[in-house]
Amino acid sequence: MLELWKYTFLGIVQGLTEFLPVSSSGHLTVISKLMNLNLETETLKAFFALLHLATFFAVLFFTYKDVWKIISGVFKKNEQRTAWKMIALLLFATLPAVVVGLGFESQIDKAFSGIVFPALMLLVTAFFLILADRFNGNKKILDLTIYTALMIGLFQAVAILPGISRSGMTVFAALLFGLSREDSVRFSFLMSLPVTFGAGIIELSKVSTETPYAISGFIAAFFAGIVGLWLLKKFVLHGKLRGFAFYCIIVSLIVLSISGGI
């Protein structure tokens, strides 16, 4: 029963922190270490990937209108140009994360091995969240160019590191390039679909019989993810990301103190 609650708790943590700008990877790495989970490295990675797949479905549920508009637009003559531009923007925004994830897999794995590095990266996340509240553009997603989509994608690629928030970095980058707060959130959500789906599918085959409670984590991550998406949208629209920055700083200092990093 204790193991069940551990997996469920990790699912809730993943669902909330995947979208709240406080770094899901950092939280999962630190918390799993503190909980002393009896999982082999590959199995732990696979479980985390399964949680990413759960958050993919949460985003899909939350953005189904946008996703359906893009898909259906491909088959409607008067909407094809808009649909294909959206697809191109999302592809180029995803490309950097794919290159970094596949090209530096071993180095990234090492970053997940301890808790000091994620704690330090939480301070980086805090810095960008404080800056994000300073921007308030008026551009729409379709005003982006392939170049700006690629640049926003670079920020997403950096967030592969534990402790760097994907949602925080992508929302910051979108705001930096002039998107409105609402469209910054929308683009961040849509960008997460290929990344979370890819991470889940690639590692899903590694889930073993040693994780019998993985489904509880999956369900918890899905519902917590929906809550996290709703909360992020509200906080971004009201320009209140700074509160999450202070949270990241506090958590970072606590973890560094526990680990002896400071």
UniProtKB/Swiss-Prot annotation:
GO CC field: plasma membrane
GO MF annotation terms: undecaprenyl-diphosphatase activity
Highest rank taxon of the organism: Bacteria
Disulfide links within the chain: none
Membrane topology, from the record: Multi-pass membrane protein
Transmembrane stretches, start-end: 44-64, 84-104, 111-131, 144-164, 187-207, 212-232, 242-262
GO biological process: cell wall organization; peptidoglycan biosynthetic process; regulation of cell shape; response to antibiotic
InterPro entries: UppP
UniProtKB keywords: Antibiotic resistance, Cell inner membrane, Cell membrane, Cell shape, Cell wall biogenesis/degradation, Hydrolase, Membrane, Peptidoglycan synthesis, Transmembrane, Transmembrane helix
This enzyme's EC code(s): 3.6.1.27
Localization of this protein: Cell inner membrane
Catalytic activity: di-trans,octa-cis-undecaprenyl diphosphate + H2O = di-trans,octa-cis-undecaprenyl phosphate + phosphate + H(+)
Additional observations: Bacitracin is thought to be involved in the inhibition of peptidoglycan synthesis by sequestering undecaprenyl diphosphate, thereby reducing the pool of lipid carrier available.
Function: Catalyzes the dephosphorylation of undecaprenyl diphosphate (UPP). Confers resistance to bacitracin.
Family of the protein in this entry: Belongs to the UppP family.
This protein's name: Undecaprenyl-diphosphatase
Organism: Kosmotoga olearia (strain ATCC BAA-1733 / DSM 21960 / TBF 19.5.1)
Lineage: Bacteria, Thermotogati, Thermotogota, Thermotogae, Kosmotogales
